[in-house]
Amino acid sequence: MNILTTEDARFIDREVPKQLGISLEILMENAGRGIVDALWGEYDLFSLNNGRSINSFVLFICGTGNNGADGLVAARHLMEQGVPAQIVLVGDINKCSDLFAVQIERCKAMGCSIDMYDEFNDWSNVAIAVEGIMGTGFTGRLREVTIDILNDIDTMRSQYNFDLWAIDVPAGLDATTGHVAEGTLTYDYTVTFGAIKQGLLLYPGKAVGGTAVVAPLGAPWQQVLGERVRTITIDSDLAEKIINYRTPMAHKGVNGNTLIIGGSNDMIGAPILAAEAAVHSGAGKVTLAVPKIIKQIVQSRVIPEVMVTSTETNKELFDCRQVVAMGPGLGRTREICDLVDHILEAYEGALVLDADALYALGHVGCVNKDALRDGDIESAYTVERELPYCVMTPHLGEFSRLIDLPIKWIERHYITLAREFAKAHQVILVLKGIPSIVALPDGTVYVNTIGNAGMGTGGMGDVLTGVIAGFISQGYSLQDSAVLGVYVHSRSADILNETKSWGYTPSDVSTSLGCVISELLGDYE
């Protein structure tokens, strides 16, 4: 599913009327109907008074721009259907948008109940409140008067226990970055138009938007955007398109030969987790190369399906490998940095770089903060070290070191920086965070939509590295392996989360990978 930014939404509003001859007024009418359909999808609107006052109604809290006008259209359609609805207005009606002026007159002609917010006091009869104070164009800070109104709505919600909906995005949420202004409320639902807005998938925005319901725009906006939309959700639909059913004649040679390089005296478990995950994701053969000093103890702990060798056997280390994954628990000595450099030069096959292998790279690029702040993306990132085509799987701290930028800056420009890094270096970047994202060399970014808080424990990233390597060994492209790996890894954790909120281990996630693969293949068949 596509993901839209603020700029994408503006582009649609501007270009759909130009290119397709579908006016903004028609798009607004469709949006209003979409709100109504979303409400019907969650409630029996003819039974609003069940457990409530006999005079219960749906309240639309509308600003005087086009976001509020969407709410006016929805209120009008509900009234036409016989569902009680009332409208309260926020802002100066004398400064309203042209389409708002059209819609408010239509509501008046239908006899809709319309009050200014300060005059409204019938909160005890509100069954559902729908907020349309401002839309996707918001950025920065909320005005004090808006904060006061939102605080008042929240107080009334606590007192009278009604659900709160947002139109397109909650007031105070930046639709692109996911950052929320002071005073932003937490909503039960957000009905958003055409496609989900990026800010609803990025924290803290994801925490305030509630359940997102995507309402169709009633226009083929995708053909207008064309290649402009490069941000896509990672979900079951996408994973089902990627995964392939195995031929009955498949054998271990067909399913690939994976090499995991990692481990040190202090980090024995990390490479074991990666190697076992490669096995559980379906790799035909998995070899784990560790320093000779820990080889014996690793052999005693790893599952028997994993072959163990020494990193000192350089000559045969890369023979017949479909993929080499390097980094889990590897260590940060000068010798390790030399080893990583040697492998980058000597090995020409598929590579997955994680953890200490990323540390060994040092700074590979730098960010111009002023350009980034000003939105001059083309000038924001400069390459300092060339990299081979590979999959890189840093968490935020590791990514911070790679691009020499504080984490707070990365969080603020999460998707932009990932996209520019992958484009500049021509690599596949799996940036592990909340949410994890996969950025491709062509500028496409995939945003993970699943996973849970139980994944916040040491070793989860090692498992992901093994999963991605395992899929590469089976013949999936690096791109598909990264996307599929992120999905399968998170979905495995979600299955465990059904019985354990947290406390499950990375090893549990690894051993549950087959359940997810079966789930996907069941749909595939």
Q: Predicted segment positions?
A:
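N-terminal small/polar loop signature for handling phosphorylated ligands or for N-terminal nucleophile
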Residues: 73-156, 296-309, 315-316
